[in-house]
Amino acid sequence: MIRIDQLWLCTAPMDMRAGAERLMSCVVQTTGGARAHHGYLFANARATRIKLLVHDGFGVWCAARRLNAGHFAWPREATAKPLSLTQSQFDALIVGLPWQRLPEMSVITRM
């Protein structure tokens, strides 16, 4: 199992032909360095494909995902610094749901 303590959304569009080295270069340029057990998400310009880059402390993992239909709910405005994601936001994002509206802690206390 790959341990991921923190997830970061890199909002600038990325060419999905990019491999782990190019993605790592982008992470280093925007954040100053890749941290162990942190995951960095990238999407293409149309937000139809995403890649996840994870530094596990020993090396780098790179995973890709695309939806059969539709696109990922990706921010329209690119920011200089990556955005932090919670686990529930990440879970919603990778299945194509609008993750931006999810609260930090989603707890139902009354019915």
Description of each model-found segment:
Residues 1-111:
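Polybasic/polar functional segments that serve as interface/processing modules
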